[in-house]
């Protein structure tokens, strides 16, 4: 009987020790090279998780062109992302929130997010197209696009405007 109690106590101690070391470290950044503002030369896409706790963290997405000039920056508060997913995800513990944010960083540069070209010649703009002239420019230039999500209900599609020499949103949807 004492042997069984000792064994049970040992197992509980081991389990408790494993549980207390369950801290999840945040991924700091991911980088991807991609032809975006030019059809041949690559730009640097970077997603960075800034902050130490989910309540004060932000996802910072930047694009630096092949000349080293930052051409795009979007910062999203982690709390905004977490709120958008709280209904469908169980994110009560800090470690779960950090794990979720790490997943978002890891998925940010999935191949499906890089669109070659941004708009094909047979695609037509719809109500989610904020700038129809830019959409037509993309049909002509055949430059690549990229899309990312700011939550489960908002996707933003961006591309380089050769006419305006800046990154613009060409589609925004659910």
Model-derived segments and their meaning:
Residues 14-17:
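C-terminal motif of bacterial Sec signal peptides marking the signal peptidase cleavage site
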Residues 19-21:
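Bacterial signal peptide processing site
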Residues 10, 39, 53, 138-140, ...:
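A generic structural signal for short, solvent-exposed coil/turn residues
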Residues 23-31, 36:
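Short N-terminal edge-element motif at the start of the domain
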Residues 36-136:
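Surface-exposed acidic loop/strand-edge motifs in secreted or periplasmic proteins
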Residues 104-174:
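Extracytoplasmic electrostatic interaction patches
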């Amino acid at each position: 009987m004492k042997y069984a109690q000792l064994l049970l106590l040992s197992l509980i101690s081991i389990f408790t020790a494993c549980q207390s070391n369950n801290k999840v470290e945040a991924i700091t950044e991911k980088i991807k090279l991609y032809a975006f503002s030019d059809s041949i030369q690559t730009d640097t896409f970077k997603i960075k998780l800034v902050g130490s706790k989910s309540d004060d963290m932000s996802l910072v997405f930047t694009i630096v062109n092949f000349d080293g000039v930052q051409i795009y920056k979007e910062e999203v508060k982690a709390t905004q992302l977490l709120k958008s997913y709280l209904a469908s995800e169980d994110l009560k513990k800090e470690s779960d929130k950090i794990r979720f944010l790490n997943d978002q960083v890891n998925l940010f540069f999935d191949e499906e997010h890089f669109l070659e070209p941004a708009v094909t010649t047979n695609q037509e703009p719809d109500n989610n197209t904020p700038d129809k002239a830019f959409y037509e420019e993309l049909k002509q230039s055949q430059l690549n696009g990229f899309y990312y999500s700011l939550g489960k209900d908002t996707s933003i599609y961006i591309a380089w405007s050769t006419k305006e020499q800046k990154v613009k949103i060409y589609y925004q949807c659910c």
